[in-house]
Amino acid sequence: MSNSPLVNYTKISPNKSSPRNHKIDTVTIHCVVGQCSVETLGNVFAPASRQASSNYGIGYDGRIGMYVEEKDRSWCSSNAANDNRAITIEVASDTKEPYAVNAKAYAALIDLLVDICKRNGIKELKWKADKSLIGQPDKQNMTVHRWFANKSCPGTYLYERHAQIASEVNKRLGSTNIKPCLLYTSPS
């Protein structure tokens, strides 16, 4: 199992379980709730008392940090089963709803997801916005933190773009099963 060659900064967190106990077949995108750098995020995950981490983080400038190697489980989604099967990615965002992500961070997220999928044999990203499909990567292999804890993570901005993210990644993966992008709209 390898790590992403796109990483610009590494600061391994003690907050992890080693090794992960499941094959990587899922991705979980989180919002940081701050327009921070990869170094700042590394410092957030450094103290053992924090009891939180992610595999990767993307700074406001589009740089990519690694905090937990892919062979290990991060402590990111408030759910051990999800974190054992998922690569978790924290993305710098605004500090309040909709927790918007800037263009540099978004572009780096797409690049990182394409790389993760290629290296881990994930042929396409699947998003149905359906919590009941957790753990069924043949139907949906993107999960969100809000499904496991009382949080708004990944925020409205990223949540409403999950179908678009999957479509952009799948196009670059050469997926033959690309569906039109259906954006999520909040109920009135």
PLM features per residue range, with description:
Residues Q35, V44, L112-K123, E168, ...:
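Structured segments of extracytoplasmic/periplasmic soluble domains
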Residues S17-S18, K179-C181:
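Residue-level detector of intrinsically disordered/flexible regions characterized by low predicted structural confidence
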Residues N170-P180:
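Low-complexity, Gly/Ser/Thr/Pro-rich intrinsically disordered linker/tail segments
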Residues R50-A52, R85-L133:
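Long, well-ordered alpha-helical scaffolding segments within enzyme catalytic domains
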Residues D72, C76-Y106, Q140-A166:
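Active-site-adjacent mobile loop/cap segments within catalytic or ligand-binding domains
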Residues Y184-S188:
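Conserved small/polar residues in nucleotide/adenosyl-binding loops
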Residues L125-F148:
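Acidic carboxylate-rich catalytic motifs and surrounding loops in phosphoryl-/glycosyl-chemistry enzymes
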Residues M1-D83, C153:
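N-terminal catalytic cores of peptidoglycan-degrading enzymes
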